[in-house]
C-alpha cells in the first residue's frame, strides 16, 4: 500500500445510503477484524451490491426469514450466511432500517496480520490469494455465523469495523454482472472492483446446479 492510509473509522451515515452508492465507495476502505489472536486489516478490492426485496439476486427478495433477518435491521451491521454446506460469506448491511440491502465483500488485500490469515488459508499459493473470493475472505478473517448481526460501531473495539482507508481513483473502479447470479438478477452491473488489482477474484457466470445422475440398477 503506497498511499497514506486514513485510519478514521467510517460513520453509520456512510452505510445509511443507497446500496449502489455504498458498494463502490467501499473499495479501498480498510476492513478491520479484531480477535483474541490478533488483528487483521484488509483493503477491500471487490464487492457486490444486493438491493433487498426489489432485487431477484438478493436473499431478501422473497421477504424476511430467520436466515436473512439481519438484512432488515439498521445499517452498519453484518450479515453472515453459510453456503454450500461449508463456506461463510460476509456482507455489510446498508440503506434505511428495514430496507434489507447489503454489500457482499468479495475480495481484498491483507495488509496487517497476514500470518493469521495464512494459518487459516493453508492452500493459498501466495498472499494475494488469501482473501481472493468471498469464502476465502471470510475464512482468512475467521468470520462465521457467530458474527452475524455484529454492529460495526459496537463499542471502542468491535470485532469488525471499517476505516476510511485509501479509495482508488474513480477511473480504476469497474463494474459488471455479479458472480454466480442467474435469472432476472443476472445482468445488473452491481459487482464493483479495482481494475488490475491481483487480489480480485475471477468472474464466473451463473451455472445451474445439476443433480447427480442415477445409475441404472
From Swiss-Prot:
Can you tell which superkingdom this protein's organism belongs to? Bacteria
The cross-references to SUPFAM superfamilies, in alphabetical order and at most eight, read: FMT C-terminal domain-like
Q: What class of enzyme is it?
A: hydrolase
Task: Give GO BP annotations, semicolon-separated.
Answer: base-excision repair
Alphabetically sorted, this entry's keywords are: DNA damage, DNA repair, Hydrolase
Question: EC number(s)?
Answer: 3.2.2.-
* Any single Pfam family the record assigns to this protein: Pur_DNA_glyco
Q: Where is the composition biased (Basic residues)?
A: 206-217
Gene3D superfamilies documented for this protein: Methylpurine-DNA glycosylase (MPG)
Q: Region annotation Disordered: residue ranges?
A: 197-217
MF terms (GO), sorted A to Z: alkylbase DNA N-glycosylase activity; DNA binding
Family per similarity comment:
Belongs to the DNA glycosylase MPG family.
Q: Which HAMAP family match?
A: 3MGH (MF_00527)
Identify this protein by name.
Putative 3-methyladenine DNA glycosylase
Amino acid at each position: 500500500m503506497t498511499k497514506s492510509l486514513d485510519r478514521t473509522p467510517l460513520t453509520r451515515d456512510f452505510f445509511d445510503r443507497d446500496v449502489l452508492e455504498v458498494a463502490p465507495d467501499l473499495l479501498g476502505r480498510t476492513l478491520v477484524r479484531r480477535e483474541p489472536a490478533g488483528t487483521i486489516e484488509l483493503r477491500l478490492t471487490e464487492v457486490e451490491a444486493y438491493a433487498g426485496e426489489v432485487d431477484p439476486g438478493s436473499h431478501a427478495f422473497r421477504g424476511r426469514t430467520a436466515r436473512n433477518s439481519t438484512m432488515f435491521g439498521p445499517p452498519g451491521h453484518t450479515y453472515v450466511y453459510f453456503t454450500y454446506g461449508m463456506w461463510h460469506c460476509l456482507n455489510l448491511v446498508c440503506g434505511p432500517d428495514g430496507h434489507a440491502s447489503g454489500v457482499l465483500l468479495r475480495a481484498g488485500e491483507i495488509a496487517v496480520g497476514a500470518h493469521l490469515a495464512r494459518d487459516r488459508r493453508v492452500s493459498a499459493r501466495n498472499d494475494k490469494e488469501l482473501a481472493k473470493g468471498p469464502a476465502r475472505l471470510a475464512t482468512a478473517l475467521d468470520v462465521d455465523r457467530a458474527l452475524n448481526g455484529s454492529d460495526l460501531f459496537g463499542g471502542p473495539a468491535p470485532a469488525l469495523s471499517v476505516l476510511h482507508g485509501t479509495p482508488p481513483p474513480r477511473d480504476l473502479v469497474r463494474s459488471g454482472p455479479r458472480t454466480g447470479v442467474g435469472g432476472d438478477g443476472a445482468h445488473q452491473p452491481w459487482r464493483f472492483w479495482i481494475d488490475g488489482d491481483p487480489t480480485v477474484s475471477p468472474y464466473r457466470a451463473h451455472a445451474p446446479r445439476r443433480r447427480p445422475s442415477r445409475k441404472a440398477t
